[in-house]
Structures are given as C-alpha cells and as structure tokens.
C-alpha cells in the first residue's frame, strides 16, 4: 500500500511539474508575441521625440529628451486640426449610417424568415469576400458620373462598403433575441420604431459598440478610398491624405523623419485611445454574436 501511495504521489508531482513547465513556456511565448506586436508602436513613440540625426544614428534608442517640438512642427505640416475635423466628420457620419442601416437590415432578415431574406443575407456575407481593388475603377467612374466625389459621397460609399460586415455581426445577435419581447411592446401600443429603439437596441449595446469601433478604426485609418474619391481637395482632406500630400516626402537631403514619425503618431492616437477604453465591449459583442448566432 505504501509503495502504491508513493507511486501515486510521484505521478501527481510529475504531472504538476509538467503543468508548471508548460505554463512557464506559454507565458514566455505570450511575452515574446506581445513584445513583437508592441515593438513598432514603441519605436514610433520614441522616434516622435527625436531629431533627424538621432533617428538615423540609433532608431531603437530612447530619445535624449522628451520634447514636443517635433510634434508641434508635424501638426503644422499636416494642418492637424482641420484634417482632424474632416476625419471626425467622415468617421462619425459613416459609422452612424452603418449602424442604423445594418441594424435595421439584419433585424428585418432575422424576423422575415423567408427564402428571400435568407438569400439577401447570403449576398451580404458573400460581398465581404470581394476585394476592394476589383471595384476601384468602376467606383471612381460611378462617383464622377453621379457627382459624388465629395465628403457626402465618401460617407455614402463607406456605408456601402461596411454594411456587409456590420449586418453579419448584428444578424448573429438578433437570432438570439426572443421575438416575444417585440410582440409585448407592440401589444402595449409601441410602433415599430419605438419597439426597435426602446426594446431591441438597448439589448445589443455590446454588439453596437463592436460595430462602431471596428468600422471607426477602418474608416479613420483608410487612405485608398478618400484618395480615390476626394483626392487633394483644398480643405477637405483627411488625416491619412494629409500624411501623403503634406511636405513629408523625400527632399534634397532625404526624408524628414523628425516630422514623419510624430505626424503618424498624432494621427493614430485618437483611435488607439477609443479602442483601449472600449475593448471590453468589443470582446463581449463578438462573443455574444457568435454564441447567439
């Protein structure tokens, strides 16, 4: 009996040691992946406070002093506040359009339960597989013929391109919402809009935040569609376009890295801050949509 007990304790200790070693290896791998992911961002931050000579001599070193001189110069070079306002307007109204249209569309498809609604949902999800590059030239031609090469036209196009993914996320959530809640609201005298915004919408906060953040990050950082639609229009360029059109290109003595790094840094700060504060909602929204779908 004593021998069997000792053998059992040895097996438990052996399993515990293997588990501990496995956890250590897992943590090392995760730390390396985190370092690999954060390294470009840290380099961007450090080099935003360096002179051009410091960057060229040792781009991975800490700055000699954390001065905002180069950030201020970069803000002037890309006309930061004006382009920030334009980017905010485009992002805000594009996301608002996406949320309203995709929420209503996904809700209608889940409640109709017909072959047509199923086919429409299939078309929307299949549209996510179409690469944007295959639509560029027809899009530019259509925008020119319909006089949509403007900020409102850009907002409408973002609504069209982002609606497929948004419907996909909302559709999975709506399938798990009991229709009895909506029927009860209708019996209490609510019209379809009151029922949707006062009963259904409050139930999908996490999914809505997920749709907002995913689309806001994409629209905020997008360069190609604004370049094709509005180009270098005076007073209506977004931050990403300003990074290209501003005087940050190769000059007689090379690239002005002391302006390029801080310009990119201040451009991505707003969307990073939004993501940090809303990441919990994003994860919950994706999980809810997957489980209920």
Predicted regions and their residues:
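Short, Lys/Arg-rich, polar N-terminal cytosolic tail immediately upstream
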Residues: 1-17
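A structural signal for multi-pass alpha-helical bundles of membrane permease subunits
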Residues: 8, 18, 22-293
